[in-house]
């Protein structure tokens, strides 16, 4: 059985750093965290819902925009076993007037742990 829990799904408040997306996908023997949103909202929502974000088998990034990745700085990296992302996920992104990319400290944390 597969259980999918939406941890954060906010599309309207990008300017206020509240936008983003994150889901937790669990089966009997695998836990996948898909995207980590922008802020600590996934941590707050997981606490409210009594959802355990430890022992993540796979962290999957859909793409490298900060509204899907920046919440990583609130995640305990020792709880993540593997990261799956397209290599271009870590390259700078442009969208209109916003400069969207992994902030240097987030990218450093990922590369230090997994590369």
Regions found by a protein language model. Give the residues of each.
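Conserved beta-strand hairpin/beta-sheet module of binuclear metal-dependent hydrolase folds
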Residues: 2-49
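Residue-level marker for well-ordered alpha-helical positions
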Residues: 19, 40, 69, 104-105
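Short, glycine/charged-enriched secondary-structure capping and boundary segments
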Residues: 19-21, 48-49, 74-76, 98-100
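Short amphipathic alpha-helical segments and helix-helix/interface helices
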Residues: 22, 72-73, 108, 112
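Short, well-ordered coil/turn elements that cap or connect secondary structure elements
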Residues: 27, 77-78, 112
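Active-site metal-binding motif and surrounding structural segment of the metallo-beta-lactamase
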Residues: 41-89
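Metallo-beta-lactamase
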Residues: 89-115
